[in-house]
């Protein structure tokens, strides 16, 4: 008996109890006898039932949950013809559904049973590979549209029917993206959707219980939220589909549903290459052929995706996307991933879609959604050869067969080959023979010489190698092809210390440093001996180290550089992927050497988080950093690769994005591509982009439990994050904390509208706590930012958040002078524009309130004395750039005093929160001279620049007392003019 036969019999026996219940006229003995007699006859239903559950644990679970299916399938096997007419059958079932609980149950039961049928047909080759993923797509589309229509009618009855300006009813249109849009859905895939509606307007409340109309945007947002819950929420019956909305304009930061015109405006003004790539698959679900709005939507999106000219610019964009995927594979340690790995499904998709983007504007036949329909079209255009066409088509079908069998085993979204022996047997069985369509759309039986796992793995690798070869020929990659040169360090890993010493003597290393260098090399080799490094890793290391050491000893500061680089190499020595990255990318290795030579901070980051090495592949990008205004969009795209409901992965990804961006900024700083003011701009706007995502993530977590405060409109949050200190002053450094205050605009006695109702104030406090938790939790990727909340009203004794009205009252009536000083450097970094305006009004009101100038001077001087006593611990021969007299803190206090002293007469002076522009305003208002203004600014920039570079070197902000003598003298003299004379 084969392993599969034994598994079939075992699985059938496990259904014995259900069979007894389904056939009361049969005893357990007779059922066992029937199994024994029929389980070796592939044409009989009993065998087919056993085979289907042997191939899929998911099918077995469905049969256990719905016992009536066991009887049906025992007597008559499902056939592919049963897997049709989904929308008609669904609508018939939903006609008797009267509440959302029943809707959820009906959708999930229908989905599970139909998916089990498709798995049955797939396992028994009752349908081709292509037919399976088309039918999976049609099932998903039917479930989405049936749920939408049911919820739409419910919403219309509750709050009215949305109308356009001409009085015509409006519908929610849904774009199915990705594989759903291309009729290529996986067995257990997420669905990527975008919601839209034709035009602005409001609901008609005739024949409803609604008291007033709402605008169409609010109606469709509510409908969209309910639809997502109906599909995505996990109940006792499971879920329908994991639903991902992040491909919509502005991603998680954007409104859930846009009108046609707003969507058109977005893609015209802000659409990016990756969004063009995604929109190739965009298809209107449930589209009626005569619906003019469907035609309008398609016509609107077509020019964005398909350009009228031949567009070769996309090749580099797609190459970069592919590079990001490869870095992601390395980051997550993905092995044997048939989707993202070399020669995987994604590379076939890239090849096809690059031609669609380049030539689709001129070649109408390329404007289709299905990959298998596009492949012959690009062959006819001679964009690929006949051989490349055959290789890609055959490999793609094989890979998709593997993917769907894998996912059908347990209804899990995986593309990684199994290590479990039973699952390996299943894949071997499924891939040796299966049905598919040939190039003429005729059903054929495909046979492969696969009898065991080794055969399967070899066949899979052959397919992937063919895909990779075509991908490299057509699109190429970013690797530098320069070869490694031999050097005097060729045998370093095997050499004894006498040979190494001789090599050092022959090199540029000073004789006085030989012993020190030898000791460091000995420690490194000893460290390698205590690490688990496979034979492949040893081989890569033996080729890499000669180049590394040769480059190190070319540098003047090799004594400090050597331990930094050796530390990185030792940390990644057991991770062959990163060793190969440095070996195969000489420019990246050179970049590591150059940056670590000038920055202890960068070397420590690379040693702690080797994933950052990927960021050094594009050396040109380091000299031309991304504009800081693009950080929100870049972060959004970075997070798209993750499941939207996996908080742990998102929290880690935020930290990785921050570290990667910090590295790029530091590199650009070292390479002279960024002046100090721009460094702080980049670090500040990076923090703001992260704050936005953190707030949205926290909001999602808290609102999923409690709902949202009922007074909020549409996509509002009623929540402000105020940045104080260096964040507020747009002056963040490499190691800066975030000084934050949380404010909210709550209505008294209002509650949330979720399943668990709480007071709105309590909701915002929980939101604030969640935000701080996301920032401060220490994961394997470190802490995101240290969030300092002590500047909130009443400091540590106060609540973690407070209402705008309470904040205003506190600042006007109870705040100390030092709190008003802090308010000078405060500005909103997250929130709706209307709330930001309210805060700015409060800030101006507080800062421009009349005050006793002598008392103000006394308070500022006293606070400076306290800070000096508390923070300054430098020796007489040292100068602390931040805290000592004549340093950064004095300049900040001068700016704060000037604003507090002069704003009562000139409220316009409160406009800025950063020191440089405050001084500019003071000079323009003739409060200080232009010469003093320029000198203060120059001193400030020079001190900050030095602090930045000390941070990069891993040093504190303390320098020798002989430095900055002129600057300190000026600052102290200016201080005395303000506060002493």
From Swiss-Prot:
GO cellular component, one term: cytosol
Biological source species: Haemophilus influenzae (strain ATCC 51907 / DSM 11121 / KW20 / Rd)
HAMAP family: GlnE (MF_00802)
Lineage: Bacteria, Pseudomonadati, Pseudomonadota, Gammaproteobacteria, Pasteurellales
Similarity comment: family membership: Belongs to the GlnE family.
Primary role: Involved in the regulation of glutamine synthetase GlnA, a key enzyme in the process to assimilate ammonia. When cellular nitrogen levels are high, the C-terminal adenylyl transferase (AT) inactivates GlnA by covalent transfer of an adenylyl group from ATP to specific tyrosine residue of GlnA, thus reducing its activity. Conversely, when nitrogen levels are low, the N-terminal adenylyl removase (AR) activates GlnA by removing the adenylyl group by phosphorolysis, increasing its activity.
Record protein name field: Bifunctional glutamine synthetase adenylyltransferase/adenylyl-removing enzyme
Enzyme Commission number(s): 2.7.7.89, 2.7.7.42
CDD domains: NT_GlnE_GlnD_like
Keywords, ordered alphabetically: ATP-binding, Magnesium, Multifunctional enzyme, Nucleotide-binding, Nucleotidyltransferase, Transferase
UniProt enzyme class: transferase
ATP-binding is among the record's keywords: yes
Cofactor or coenzyme needed: Mg(2+)
Annotated disulfide bonds: none
Catalysed conversion reaction: [glutamine synthetase]-O(4)-(5'-adenylyl)-L-tyrosine + phosphate = [glutamine synthetase]-L-tyrosine + ADP; [glutamine synthetase]-L-tyrosine + ATP = [glutamine synthetase]-O(4)-(5'-adenylyl)-L-tyrosine + diphosphate
InterPro entries associated with the record: GlnE, GlnE_rpt_dom, NT_sf, PII_UdlTrfase/GS_AdlTrfase
Segments for region (Adenylyl removase): 1-479
Region (Adenylyl transferase): 483-981
GO terms for biological process, alphabetical: regulation of glutamine family amino acid metabolic process
